[in-house]
Amino acid sequence: MSSSFLQLTQVSIEFPTDNGPYVALVDVNLDIAEKEFISLIGHSGCGKSTVMNIVAGMYKATTGGVLLENREVNEPGPERAVVFQNHSLLPWLTSYQNVELAVNQVFKTTKSKAQRHDWIMHNLELVHMTHAKDKLPSEISGGIKQRVGIARALAMEPKVLLMDEPFGALDALTRAHLQDSLMEIHADLGNTVIMITHDVDEAVLLSDKIVMMTNGPAATVGDILNIELERPRNRLELADNEQFNHYRAEVLRFLLDRHKKEVA
């Protein structure tokens, strides 16, 4: 029996192509503790999204597998919620209705209508979006759309929150505000979070561990960096923090080394 909350063991996956099998991942091993915040980082094509899709149950590994609380993951489930870079809100539904859709899917048989309403409002409040509850996606900014997308994911009460470059399309200020909100939510709720990012500073600021992927094809885990910065974290205080800058340099060194090997 595994003692890990979430465990990937010898995960490999290949996809059929006209030129034969494309090997995307080889022997990916990860042990993730409950309530940990993990970032996946690496160059484009290194299999970060593929790892996330396997954990989400949208892809099945060719060999190896995933265990969540010692149960095999082989299909999507409400205990794993995904937030994409594109908010993926349904354009004909209000913010409230977009969250309601997820809540009804998970809780229709276990919560009354009044309880579901309270739960929707609670999750919109978590991301400071109650003021936008009656607005359509076309009526709100990109940052607000992403907040609603996060509320929708949290409303499923997932054990694992999967985030695929959730702030990648946002301006720097909106991104910083959402990073701060995510740190507060993670501290309050204690979800296990796996986030894909290309932003080294974001990874160091948010994470307990940074998983650095080698270049694809046949990508795997190149190194794992434990981030031992005290929480709660303040971005302004960390700007001149020696330990923060050490971690940042370690990740950059790994990425630059991989880039040199690719072009050599």
What are these regions (language model features)?
Residues 150:
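Hydrophobic anchor residue at the start of the ABC signature
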Residues 104, 111-132, 184:
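Conserved ABC ATPase "signature" region
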Residues 41-43:
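The feature captures the beta-strand-to-loop junction immediately N-terminal to the Walker
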Residues 135-138, 156:
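Conserved signature/switch motifs of ABC ATPase nucleotide-binding domains
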Residues 64-76, 112:
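Conserved ABC transporter NBD signature motif
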Residues 56:
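Helix-to-loop junction immediately C-terminal to a conserved catalytic motif
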Residues 93-102:
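Short coil-to-helix segment of the ABC ATPase nucleotide-binding domain corresponding to the Q-loop/switch region
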Residues 161-164:
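Catalytic Walker B motif of ABC-type/P-loop ATPase nucleotide-binding domains
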